[in-house]
Amino acid sequence: MALSPEEVNHVAMLARLALSEDEKTAFAEQLTLILDYVERLNELDTGEVEPLIHILPVFNVLRQDEALPGSSQEEILSNAPLVEDGQYKVPRII
């Protein structure tokens, strides 16, 4: 499937790329080679191949949730530069 420089220009316009004429010609040749290779891959008979989600047999390895004691409000707020009424105080933005 040969791509013309005009088709490359159209794709470049959609991608908002500015290409020189030499680049358009070079990309047309390179993209043609890529598309030809993909066409060859499409010809493969994969009817006997089982669909894969992942190439390796990896499964989720999960651990049991364990509730741990949290920090107190005083401990958490002790790191803040400004605190007011048990809350972080930050400078006004607007």
UniProtKB/Swiss-Prot annotation:
Protein name listed in UniProt: Aspartyl/glutamyl-tRNA(Asn/Gln) amidotransferase subunit C
Gene field: gatC
GO terms of biological process kind: glutaminyl-tRNAGln biosynthesis via transamidation; regulation of translational fidelity; translation
Catalytic activity of the protein: L-glutamyl-tRNA(Gln) + L-glutamine + ATP + H2O = L-glutaminyl-tRNA(Gln) + L-glutamate + ADP + phosphate + H(+); L-aspartyl-tRNA(Asn) + L-glutamine + ATP + H2O = L-asparaginyl-tRNA(Asn) + L-glutamate + ADP + phosphate + 2 H(+)
SUPFAM superfamilies: Glu-tRNAGln amidotransferase C subunit
Molecular function per GO: asparaginyl-tRNA synthase (glutamine-hydrolyzing) activity; ATP binding; glutaminyl-tRNA synthase (glutamine-hydrolyzing) activity
Keyword Cell wall biogenesis/degradation: no
Species: Syntrophomonas wolfei subsp. wolfei (strain DSM 2245B / Goettingen)
Record's function text: Allows the formation of correctly charged Asn-tRNA(Asn) or Gln-tRNA(Gln) through the transamidation of misacylated Asp-tRNA(Asn) or Glu-tRNA(Gln) in organisms which lack either or both of asparaginyl-tRNA or glutaminyl-tRNA synthetases. The reaction takes place in the presence of glutamine and ATP through an activated phospho-Asp-tRNA(Asn) or phospho-Glu-tRNA(Gln).
Record's keyword annotation contains RNA-binding: no
Source superkingdom: Bacteria
Subunit structure: Heterotrimer of A, B and C subunits.
